[in-house]
């Protein structure tokens, strides 16, 4: 027995030591719910506090309820490892996690701060991960906050509920709710995380009145939502959107009755009564979610979202703050149309099927005939109808209905060769590839043969983002000048971010105005 206990003690000590930062020593922060112990890295000068609870675990009676204020804890809570990530399928290979497994108990956030003892009122970045509201986690290497913290910014990533666990709506849940609606739990988690940052970030040297929210894909859609939401909009000082807005056709919020009906039909498919369904285990629910493959949309719940985003922006009710946004030059590849060879005739058939009476006008705007030009045209059409138009509409709404500066980019840097020496198609920058550039994390993301060009582009994009987070203006530090846009300009300035970044007049806005005539009538 003694031998066993000694072995167990050695293994335990070894595991603790392996989890510790070899260059670190303990640091402490006092937040509203208690004392946290994090790590100070003496090589970087950055403090990290990982796995901080910002709400009670949404389990048991708190499943499918809005986030509840975190309980006080006694003593010192260790904040040195990432908390569990939300329950989710394995979706995309570029999601590389450092979190401690998966759990419904997932409402944790992470803080990287450069603050020294005398520092206070540092600018703050709160970053929402992407993943279609069905996957993702704040521990992913590409979202790491250390590089941006070295720029004098307090960085936070926040976990939120996903898929069935985060967006399930049902009439019975709505009856129980104090605001008589259901769904949107993941977005409510984000809003609660933002409120936690507002209330506690001073403990990490951050300025609660200088919080910029940002995100990519579903994180960008979430950023647009919180600019509009009455629960969130007063807590932010700026917003950055990378590829996506919660505007038709990119996952626009649906009426509560429609979301509730999706929930009713899902429960019916499972063969359980509603009462039985509520009591199922995490594993049982996850199995049913995988089996039935239902998407649970954002909801117009009258609480987090009283109206659609266009309606809120047109009424000038959104956060009146500086906005920096953009998208990538090939968000969706030509493969969206099927297998090679691509032909103009095949493309025209797809356009006519999709655009119906508007097909002739669409084909004039998407005019590539053959070869690489045709591939770019196919990519443009697929990308625009996926999330480029919605991001442009967000841009257009804010410049029209705010006196705050708006900055727009087009990220165009091609991927380098991968570790096998294979080069991707040379038609543009694909979806999500800019994240590690913008946040300065190339060195943490494996699988690519990064070059000096990549590092240069990363320094430029990170520099623009850091300047914007600090001042509401991306310009400075000898970066190429980035003009703000005017409300009525049909060819507004766009910062093309590439090996040689430069501002150019927008060339493709006629496409977005065309799509606006189709999509804006259905908000």
Question: Which stretches of residues belong to each language-model region?
Answer:
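Surface-exposed helix-capping loop/turn segments at secondary-structure junctions
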Residues: 113-122, 201-210, 270-275, 396-407, ...
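Bacterial Sec-dependent N-terminal signal peptides
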Residues: 1-23
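Serine-hydrolase-like catalytic core of hydrolytic proteins
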Residues: 91-274, 303-306, 312-337
